């Protein structure tokens, strides 16, 4: 055939192919138009953390027997356990317990292997601060339970 006619045929096929691709993209775009928005207005809306969420560690001072299992299973030897041996009863007495959340990787090994269950993970994840030294929590600050997102009336909770 003539080169001009074949050029017009190729041009027509390319035009049809381009229109089909544009139509497919438009169909995909329209399929997303009727979905609900997924944006969360963070300070005023929060997602409820799942049951297995690994947030800040909660520590119960009275249950701890200063066995230091948490230190041994921690991949970075993070918890600092200070204890004193009571010679009359031949038991360890816990003096101080602290965790630096600036270094903690929230692996959960300390919680999993604690024999007395004095450690547990909370749903608190808002640990940001301007000074990294404020992330070093002692037994008093570790013992405070965080305010539950569900109980906070100023925040609208959103289920996953």
Swiss-Prot record:
Cell compartments where the protein resides: Plastid, Chloroplast thylakoid membrane
Binding positions for [4Fe-4S] cluster 1 per the UniProt entry: 64, 67, 70, 114
Note describing how the cofactor binds: Binds 2 [4Fe-4S] clusters per subunit.
GO molecular function, one term: NADH dehydrogenase (ubiquinone) activity
Function: NDH shuttles electrons from NAD(P)H:plastoquinone, via FMN and iron-sulfur (Fe-S) centers, to quinones in the photosynthetic chain and possibly in a chloroplast respiratory chain. The immediate electron acceptor for the enzyme in this species is believed to be plastoquinone. Couples the redox reaction to proton translocation, and thus conserves the redox energy in a proton gradient.
Quaternary structure (record): NDH is composed of at least 16 different subunits, 5 of which are encoded in the nucleus.
The protein, known as: NAD(P)H-quinone oxidoreductase subunit I, chloroplastic
Organism per entry: Cucumis sativus
Classification of source organism: Eukaryota, Viridiplantae, Streptophyta, Embryophyta, Tracheophyta
Gene name as annotated: ndhI
């Amino acid at each position: 055939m003539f080169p001009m006619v074949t050029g017009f045929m190729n041009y027509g096929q390319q035009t049809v192919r381009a229109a089909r691709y544009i139509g497919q993209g438009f169909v995909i775009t329209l399929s997303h138009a009727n979905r609900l928005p997924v944006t969360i207005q963070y300070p005023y809306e929060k997602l409820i953390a799942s049951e297995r969420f690994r947030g800040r560690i909660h520590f119960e001072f009275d249950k701890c027997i200063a066995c230091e299992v948490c230190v041994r299973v921690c991949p970075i030897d993070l918890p600092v356990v200070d204890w004193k041996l009571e010679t009359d009863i031949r038991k360890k007495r816990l003096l101080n317990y602290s965790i630096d959340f600036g270094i903690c990787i929230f692996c959960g090994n300390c919680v999993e292997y604690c024999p007395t269950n004095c450690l547990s993970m909370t749903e608190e994840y808002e640990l940001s601060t301007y000074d990294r030294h404020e992330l070093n929590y002692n037994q008093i600050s570790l013992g405070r339970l965080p305010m539950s997102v569900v109980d906070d009336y100023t925040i609208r909770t959103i289920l996953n």
